[in-house]
Amino acid sequence: MPKRKDIQKIMVIGSGPIVIGQAAEFDYAGTQACLSLKEEGYSVVLVNSNPATIMTDKEIADRVYIEPITLEFVARILRKERPDALLPTLGGQTGLNMAMELSKSGLLEELGVELLGTKLSAIDQAEDRDLFKQLMEELGQPIPESEIVNTVDEALEFAAGIGYPVIVRPAFTLGGTGGGICSNEEELQEIAENGLKLSPVTQCLIERSIAGFKEIEYEVMRDGADNALVVCNMENFDPVGIHTGDSIVFAPSQTISDYEYQMLRDASLKIIRALKIEGGCNVQLALDPHSFKYYVIEVNPRVSRSSALASKATGYPIAKLAAKIAVGLTLDEIINPVTGSTYAMFEPALDYVVAKIPRFPFDKFEQGERRLGTQMKATGEVMAIGRNIEESLLKACRSLEVCVDHNELPALSQVSDDELMRKIVKAQDDRLFYISEAIRRGYSPDEIAELTKIDVFFLDKLLHIYEIEQELASHIGDSYVLKKAKQNGFADTKIASLWDMTAEQVRRIRQEQKIVPVYKMVDTCAAEFESATPYFYSTYGFENESVKSSKESVLVLGSGPIRIGQGVEFDYATVHSVKAIQAAGYEAIIMNSNPETVSTDFSVSDKLYFEPLTFEDVMNVIELEQPKGVIVQFGGQTAINLAEPLSKAGVKILGTQVADLDRAEDRDLFEQALKELDIPQPPGQTATNEEEAVEAARKIGFPVLVRPSYVLGGRAMEIVENEADLRSYMRTAVKASPDHPVLVDSYIVGDECEVDAISDGRQVLIPGIMEHIERAGVHSGDSMAAYPPQTLSQKVKDTIADYTKRLALGLNCIGMMNIQFVIKDEQVYVIEVNPRASRTVPFLSKVTDIPMAQVATRLILGETLAELGYEDGLYPESSMVHIKAPVFSFTKLAKVDSLLGPEMKSTGEVMGSDRTLEKALYKAFEASYLHLPNFGNIVFTIAGDSKEEALQLAQRFANIGYGIWATKGTASYFENHGLHVRLVEKIGSDDDKDIPAYIRKGKVQAIINTVGTKRTADKHGQIIRSSAIEHGVPLFTALDTADAMLKVLESRSFTTEAI
């Protein structure tokens, strides 16, 4: 069927902010889809609230709206733009739910807007648990015994009938939100109650648990002419019971027979045809390891996290083709862009093994609940490609950036056998390492399989890795064993530790013996057809397929997996850097390990190496490609940490030089630089042990801010008030960065702001100053930020511009740098300098219209600001007000305290823009799902030193009609100052009348809770905060954020005064 001519303008809905369960894979999908539709000649309108995405760049769609994805705003845009059609299946669960809401509101019908791609009825059938069950029964497809429930009592009654364990799956939620496995009545009561609350239709499926079955996924495509194919099938290392987003996954499936493969393939195709899905779809199945019995677990009728993995694993661009199918093209008409010669109807074939390992946030949240279940907890993932399972698994392990270069955590050698077995049976995020340790201790694969239900085949591969370790240890220097180890994915550093030499020595031995990697092409067809994709992975075999270009090239290092502190913003900068390299006439090469992102789409760069970002792997690529130099500024801390070893190995680092990077990152050198440049900073000292830290703090005076040097996202950063807390910090937290000392700084309570600057070494362009809404003490990544600044005097702005220029030139910055300031009594202090692109680059690029990463890259390659048409100094401010607001994933992370402080906790961001501060704030709150009604009850539970300020907020809330409730100390302070409040207990003896009870009953509309300086003793506060998160009640732990929300409410309310 030719593409449709009756539609001209199509609206695409993005997926909004990054949260656990919905990450960068939707930026990749949305970007591909918009470009694909434009390629076919359609006009594209995009709506997304997340500025840190490539898809919200002006050139991706014809009209880009960075607005909240809520009915109110999407309806306005629909009325204004009047598109002919809407494509919702590329915006994750957010896009689907929005389409359902628009349809139910009658607006699509009123405006004559057609839904493209998969029809609403099919989305409903796949997402509504009852309809899905009916369809499967009609198709004769087996599903586990189950019951749809709308109340907790119904859930308990059904479970009593079929017996425990049971699985709870809420309808229309993302990443298993609110679900879980329940072994008894008590657990079911809790999980079902929570699941019903989180489901937008108050519906859950309770089903018999089939935990222990193999989990197999099929990524399938279908077009309007009923052509359907399997793009990729994948097997989870972990059996059913652990969310697929938290499982290690291999593609293609490794342990199923051809008969089983065909049986599950037929089932998947039968389901996609019955649902009449047009585009991509993911089918999850459970296979009994002891028979040919299987169950259908669920179907995602949209592009998903698995689609991104399948696209990168096979090279087959699912989202791009799904968009073409949506406008009527069929798979047998679309040319596969990878081969350029076969049609998209051709099923990909793989002659390699792909491993995906999730990246979890527990290095940030040590107190978080690490047990894995049906609710997703990973923030990101890595992918690695190899010729065998061992190679791809070990490459993926070292891509994780959790300080391991192998499937081994050194600390586990100290763990008792009992503890080891416990951790293996009760799966946590690090179970792979515990299983590997058990194998090293002599437990057999069969014993471990019995305990974990993981297939013996995979455990045998772990045993094989251990056998090679032993061979290496007993054959030091042996080239035959060295080659075997390299063919099975061993890193030089691991071999060096077994041979008791340096990695450099191992590398030399390898090179002398000509044991070097070759690079193979990912071509979707197992080399059956000619292919020209510049997409490569390394292996130790024969025949290198990557040929060094005749053109001069530049290598850009990506930022690896998405984690808290290093998100999609860095991928955004990487992609823009590549565009600038190409525009300057060079060949751009990207190296990265993250399957979710735009940077690892092979059509972005001239060459893509899907490899771990370690010194060894990067050097191997450099030796083959011989680039002009390497750019490390855009890959976050991952890339910056590689600058020094690469430079020592003689590699040219482009942009700011290593010695200058060091001056910004090393505390003593930085202090010296600031003194020379005459720039004030809060008084501080470095300490290498506990006594030095205590001595420094006494000298400076408490409170002090303590942190390790060289970290990202405020890892292990704390504000300490007294010596006892400082000693405890030094004993527990300093392992964050053992080679570097701890910084002890005077903690200044002031207004914080930050600047991104771009310098060519002579002139400095400052695109803008962002003012944080929360005062110093909340990590910059968790603060709301306003551009242009709303309260800074001209004098302060001038000082900031002056200090920025001095710093950029004084530290010989070429390219980009980020500086954070704190302002107290009009005095400006520098808190820190990052000599690289920061997480604010996409936001600031969007609001100033300066493509900052592109400009910085051109300067890194030798051009000047003047040549690019930019002037020295602070760029003129925008007339609009733009707010960047953080978004958190606390609902997914049990036991993680939602209290904001100097360590970063947010997973994503949104932007709100309008002509006034209040309107921009309103949009930012709406986009980040912080919605406050115009009236209701608000609870204040406030620490001693903030009561005076809280009283002013409470009075303002009372003026607009809110009922003020407060806990004991806060209530008496408010009453003493003439404000009438209702007294409530924090955590009461009568658990029907305390704050969590009122939250459960829906009596509380918001909570404002601050803690004193002894944050640790705040057990009750943590229970209240968790309760608010669980029930979706807006929670403010910084008074400044509550003040911003009040501004919005006040601007929306009319003044009603008696005369």
UniProtKB/Swiss-Prot annotation:
Q: Where along this sequence does the record place binding of Mg(2+) 4?
A: 832, 834
Residue ranges constituting the MGS-like domain according to the UniProt record: 930-1059
Cofactor mode of binding and number, as noted:
Binds 4 Mg(2+) or Mn(2+) ions per subunit.
* Residues binding Mn(2+) 4: 832, 834
- Which positions in this protein are listed as binding Mg(2+) 2? 298, 300
Q: State where Mn(2+) 1 binds.
A: 284, 298
The Enzyme Commission number assigned here is 6.3.4.16, 6.3.5.5
In its keyword annotation, does this UniProt entry include RNA-binding? no
Q: According to its UniProt record, which cofactors does this protein need? A: Mg(2+); Mn(2+)
Q: Does the keyword Amino-acid biosynthesis apply?
A: yes
InterPro entries, sorted: ATP-grasp (IPR011761), ATP_grasp_subdomain_1 (IPR013815), CarbamoylP_synth_lsu (IPR006275), CarbamoylP_synth_lsu_oligo (IPR005480), CarbamoylP_synth_lsu_oligo_sf (IPR036897), CbamoylP_synth_lsu-like_ATP-bd (IPR005479), CbamoylP_synth_lsu_CPSase_dom (IPR005483), MGS-like_dom (IPR011607)
- All copies of the ATP-grasp domain together span 133-327, 671-861
Q: Which residues bind Mg(2+) 3?
A: 820, 832
GO molecular function annotation: ATP binding; carbamoyl-phosphate synthase (ammonia) activity; carbamoyl-phosphate synthase (glutamine-hydrolyzing) activity; metal ion binding
Q: What's any GO biological process attached to this entry?
A: L-arginine biosynthetic process
* Gene Ontology CC: cytoplasm
Q: Segment Allosteric domain: which positions?
A: 930-1059
Question: Where on this chain does ATP 1 bind?
Answer: 129, 169, 175-176, 208, 210, 215, 241-243, 284, 298
Segments carrying the region annotation (Carbamoyl phosphate synthetic domain) are 547-929
Q: Where is this region: Carboxyphosphate synthetic domain?
A: 1-401
Q: Where is this region: Oligomerization domain?
A: 402-546
The pathway is: Amino-acid biosynthesis; L-arginine biosynthesis; carbamoyl phosphate from bicarbonate: step 1/1; Pyrimidine metabolism; UMP biosynthesis via de novo pathway; (S)-dihydroorotate from bicarbonate: step 1/3
| Entry comment, domain topic | The large subunit is composed of 2 ATP-grasp domains that are involved in binding the 2 ATP molecules needed for carbamoyl phosphate synthesis. The N-terminal ATP-grasp domain (referred to as the carboxyphosphate synthetic component) catalyzes the ATP-dependent phosphorylation of hydrogencarbonate to carboxyphosphate and the subsequent nucleophilic attack by ammonia to form a carbamate intermediate.
Q: Which family does the entry's similarity section mention?
A: Belongs to the CarB family.
In terms of NCBIfam families, this protein maps to:
CPSaseII_lrg, PRK05294.1, PRK12815.1
Protein name from the UniProt record: Carbamoyl phosphate synthase large chain
Species of origin: Streptococcus sanguinis (strain SK36)
Q: Which gene encodes it?
A: carB
